[in-house]
Amino acid sequence: MSRRGTTEEKTAKSDPIYRNRLVNMLVNRILKHGKKSLAYQIIYRALKKIQQKTEKNPLSVLRQAIRGVTPDIAVKARRVGGSTHQVPIEIGSAQGKALAVRWLLGASRKRPGRNMAFKLSSELVDAAKGSGDAIRKKEETHRMAEANRAFAHFR
């Protein structure tokens, strides 16, 4: 056991324009090869496209999309007596948001389209409406957890 004290949980910083932590989470997840300015450009263009498509506040659409994709429960592989079981576990809000952001970006990368800003804006609008690949991924995870409910006591 470590003799050091517990580390404080890092608080996510806000982005410079929208002053929002979710936007910063998106930027940090979309980041490739340390090109943060390009990541900011992509996110801001996507938010501008959302504004044009829906004529709503893009931050509220983003919040709604992330709320819709955030899972309550997930499955974790656990080895018990030579066989591996998918054990359902409850997820905290921070971990759920991180998963939601990851799924949204993965779904938008798979989408056909011109550029990442366009694909991300389309995926966010779809997720806010309750459709799209990210929503399907959440439902699939919930189905897996429900199917393996018998192994919940292995936690």
From Swiss-Prot:
Protein localization: Plastid, Chloroplast
GO biological process terms held by the UniProt record: translation
Transmembrane regions: none
Keyword line: Chloroplast, Plastid, Ribonucleoprotein, Ribosomal protein, RNA-binding, rRNA-binding
Molecular function terms, GO-annotated: rRNA binding; structural constituent of ribosome
UniProt key word Zinc: no
The keyword Cell inner membrane appears for this protein: no
Primary localization class, coarse: plastid
GO cellular component terms listed in the entry, alphabetical order: chloroplast; small ribosomal subunit
Family: Belongs to the universal ribosomal protein uS7 family.
Function: One of the primary rRNA binding proteins, it binds directly to 16S rRNA where it nucleates assembly of the head domain of the 30S subunit.
Assembly: Part of the 30S ribosomal subunit.
Protein name in the entry: Small ribosomal subunit protein uS7cz/uS7cy
